Structures are given as C-alpha cells and as structure tokens.
C-alpha cells in the first residue's frame, strides 16, 4: 500500500468541501485510490490522506487527479508528501 498526503487551501466551507470530495471519489477510485480521509487543519485548510493500491497508480495519476480535483472543487494544493505504508494498526 502507498499513501499520499495533500494539503489544500479552500474557502472555509467544510460541508461543501466534504460534498465535493464525495462527488470526486469515484474518479479517484478509478485511478487506484482505496481509501481517503480528510482533516480540517485550519480555517481555510484541509489535509487529505489517500491510500492507493500501488506506488505505480500514484505515479501514473496523482498530478492529474490533484489538478482535476482542485478545478472541480475550487481548492488549491499547498503541499504534499507520499510514501509506502510502514505499519497499519486497527
């Protein structure tokens, strides 16, 4: 499993951001995303964590998905990191 963390700037309307993320989720799944979580990190910022089936899926699709998501929901990427999942605990 591979994970990406993306920092987004948005208009501060959390409910709208959630609905937009839900609407865009099917496109992310088509690109190989397995799970996505979002955390409000400030009045106008959200950080997403997305799990992917493979690093190859991320490398093939991440820039395209970030651009399309940003355009579709009016958010802009302010930062990001990625890496292989080292441990998963339930």
Language-model features: where?
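Short S/T/G/P-rich N-terminal loop/turn motif that feeds into the first structured element of a domain
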Residues: 1-68, 74-90
């Amino acid at each position: 499993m591979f994970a990406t963390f993306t920092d987004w700037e948005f208009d501060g309307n959390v409910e709208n951001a959630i609905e937009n993320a839900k609407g865009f989720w099917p496109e992310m799944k088509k690109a190989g995303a397995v799970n996505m979580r979002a955390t409000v990190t400030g009045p106008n910022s959200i950080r997403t964590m997305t799990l992917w089936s493979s690093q190859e899926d991320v490398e093939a699709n991440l820039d395209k998905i970030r651009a399309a998501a940003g355009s579709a929901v009016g958010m802009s990427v302010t930062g990001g990191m990625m890496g292989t999942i080292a441990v998963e605990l339930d």
